[in-house]
Amino acid sequence: MGASDFDAQPDATMGVLPVVDARGAYVVPGLIDIHSDYVENVASPRPSVVMDLSTSLYKADRELVSHGVTTIFHSLSVYGAHVFDHKPIRDFGNVSALIDRVAALRAGEERDHLIRHRLHMRVELDSVDLYDDIESFLRSGKVDLVSFMDHTPGQGQYRDLLVFGDTLKGYRDVSDEDVRDIVRQQQESQKLTYAQITALAAVARERGVSIASHDDDSEDKLAFMDGLEATISEFPISLDIARAARARGMHTIAGAPNVMLGHSHSGNLSAREAVQAGAIDVLCSDYYPAALLDAVFTLRDQCGLDIAKAFALVTINPAKAAGIADEVGSIAVGKRADVLLVREISCGEGESSGEHPGARPDGRAARTMPVVTRAFVGGRSVFRSHYPDQPLGYGRDPEQLVSLDQLTRPLAKAV
């Protein structure tokens, strides 16, 4: 949306954003991350350690806004079995406690924390014994997005059993025979039935909870999830499946780290290729919040994607996917004023999201990266950072510019 879309005379009585010097910056909507388990890493910095959960959410709140995230969907997983490793933070007791604490943060939105907190409940199909708990949470109003996952080896993300085995060995000291036993156990384990999944999806729809599929690898799975009125396909396995999901009107999600790495960490769909093909329309941070903003500029500089289209992948498109586009996702009259100032700064030499030949005195390419220098949530300033090479006065409020002007005048000699 351009400046011409707004009245040129702002109404100061409406309590809108203060006038801020944004020279040289991109003025963009706050980023919306609908799949992130980052809070697990904050709460559990070591596999056997679980820190205070409320404090961890507030710590994550501060870190996420520094990366431009103004709406976060904490992705908390409900598992029946822990195949790769056992993380106490993913025990159902801790997951339940986190769900309650996220709901409490939402109740205090724009008052006692910095960004908007939402809940994405990830349901693994082996969570048979937790069915009643899952249904209860869906009815509670604490869940904003639910996804159904199946990490059984031989399909989905691990349709290649060699990839599953290599991944498992990266977590645990197991032999090839152990891997075969685990594959057999997982394939034979009890799963939620189609009837149970259908019933949970009906509760979700009744409560206005968005529904997502996960690791889609076939037209049949897409058809089933489409029948449940799922609006999102997370991490489709191939370009053909991503295109098929889009053809059904589903939003398709890939990980921003995939964009940064240039490939999937598990050997599946390349996010860069899929975005360029129009088969992916949403990026999420997955496990690395810093990648969201970096991915936008990587797509611009290394893939030739228009910067506005790149930003849409992390703003308005995820807002539409999660059903919150009437509130956030774009800078528009009537929406919440979640706004960022983003600037590219020099950070040495070499590969980067942006290469600018001749920017250095020696004529070599300067490495740049995007940074958030100011963030507003609901029209309130919640974050500010300053780098030495920013223009004097950049990002400051008008009343501060007077004193800056005085500071730049030559000092009079004492007589």
Model-inferred region functions:
Residues 1-28, 388:
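Histidine-rich, glycine-flanked metal-binding segment
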Residues 22-96:
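Metal-associated gating/positioning segment near the N- to mid-region
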Residues 79-216:
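Metal-coordinating catalytic core of metallo-dependent amide/deamination hydrolases
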Residues 140-144, 225-232, 247-253, 278-281:
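Glycine-enriched alpha-helix->loop->beta-strand junction motifs that scaffold or abut catalytic
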Residues 191-193, 213-215, 233-242, 261-268:
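A general structural motif
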